[in-house]
């Protein structure tokens, strides 16, 4: 990186795109992930240069980025290719609410908008605290969050935390601490035994089929199935560890639990 703050940034995941827009720093963005949909205008304003685990390296290089923002080990191969070409890369790895707030503050500092980032993060913290307090004394339905269906994968830490803030009780909180999806596999019998009152599903961009969930062998007596409380939470709202999850994602969970 030869310019600081970086003037030309490429974001290979959605949450950094939304964060930069919220900070008023969108003019620094010169390329985004093909999955970036927040805010809606990003799809018309910024060229798409990647999927999630693959990227158009020549296109990225042609955009002459000062900095490329990535996420986790899942993009390690992309990161490796870019580093070999001399590109400065920053990989975030937030997996819980505290990490999301830290990412916002850190990215703000990187682009010279530390004050704006602090206000944004503080506003989110206040919002989360207010909702948690409002739900403290309400009955807490047991919630199974399904991130994928075949195999079944339970929710990651930030999702588990948001379920609790929204007034629910995650039935697999011990699994949520695992970063890798392979460590959050659950068996059908595990869910039957947990007997969730509500099932929330967000299948990583694939359309959730509630009838398919309800038809699983042995699930007919699960309270959530019996009472038809199976709800889809759209992936862009909840599976991106950034502003969307703390706002619209959280609100969607609270509506489903009410």
What are these regions (language model features)?
Residues 1-258:
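N-terminal ligand-binding lobe of clamshell/alpha-beta domains
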């Amino acid at each position: 990186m030869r310019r600081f703050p970086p003037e030309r940034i490429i974001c290979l995941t959605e949450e950094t795109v939304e964060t930069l827009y919220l900070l008023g720093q969108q003019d620094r963005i010169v390329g985004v992930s093909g999955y970036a949909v927040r805010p809606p205008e990003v799809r018309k304003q910024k060229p798409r240069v990647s999927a999630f685990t693959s990227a158009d390296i020549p296109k990225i290089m042609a955009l002459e980025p000062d900095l490329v923002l990535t996420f986790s080990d899942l993009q390690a191969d992309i990161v490796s290719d870019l580093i070999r070409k001399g590109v400065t890369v920053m990989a975030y790895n937030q997996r819980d609410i505290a990490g999301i707030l830290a990412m916002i503050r850190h990215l703000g500092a990187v682009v010279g908008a530390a004050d704006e980032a602090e206000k944004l993060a503080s506003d989110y913290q206040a919002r989360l605290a207010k909702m948690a307090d409002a739900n403290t004394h309400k009955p807490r339905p047991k919630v199974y969050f399904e991130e994928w269906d075949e195999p079944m994968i339970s929710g990651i830490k930030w999702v588990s935390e948001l379920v609790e803030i929204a007034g629910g009780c995650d039935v697999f909180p011990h699994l949520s601490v695992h970063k890798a999806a392979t460590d959050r596999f659950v068996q059908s019998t595990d869910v039957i035994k947990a007997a969730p009152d509500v099932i929330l599903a967000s299948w990583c961009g694939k359309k959730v089929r509630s009838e398919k969930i309800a038809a699983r062998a042995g699930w007919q007596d699960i309270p959530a199935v019996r009472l038809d409380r199976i709800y889809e939470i759209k992936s862009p709202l909840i599976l991106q560890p950034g502003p969307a999850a703390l706002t619209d994602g959280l609100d969607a969970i609270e509506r489903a639990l009410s």
